[in-house]
Amino acid sequence: MINKSFSQTIVVPENQTAIFLGSGILPVFATPAMIALMENTAMKVLSDLPEGKTSVGISMNTNHLKACLVGEKIHCKATILSFEGRKYTFHVIATNENGDIIGEGTHERVIVDVEKFMSKLK
């Protein structure tokens, strides 16, 4: 499982800018949107879990290093660094079309039983 990875590419839409999401006043790819992309990419690494199981994010430690405009392509990759029991740690990285790193960090996810998890919230 270590080094298993998933990659995906998006084109920055208007609704993922800092001004749209309220995290800033500029029309650039928002930090919350970058983090959501990283989390989604890591989730997809674990897409082959048994029925009734899913992973939930529990930790994100990332740096947003470079701004991107609407219409730019962003490539995101998540790779399993380690796992212990139900907890998986990922390296996450996002780059622009020139290969410049726009964000990088680590993310942790835990495998849960969907039914048990949701029943605790009622």
What are these regions (language model features)?
Residues 1-29:
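Catalytic strand-loop segment that frames the active site of acyl-thioester-processing enzymes
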Residues 6-8, 56-60, 72-76, 86-88, ...:
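A generic structural signal for short beta-strands and their flanking turns/coil linkers
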Residues 9-13, 63, 108-110:
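Generic structural detector for well-ordered beta-strands
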Residues 31-35:
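Conserved N-terminal beta-strand and adjoining loop/helix that marks the start
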Residues 36-40, 44:
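Short, residue-level hotspots on alpha-helical faces of the histone-fold
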Residues 43-75:
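Hydrophobic beta-strand-centered segment that forms part of the acyl-chain substrate-binding groove
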Residues 70, 80-122:
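HotDog/MaoC-like acyl-thioester-processing domains
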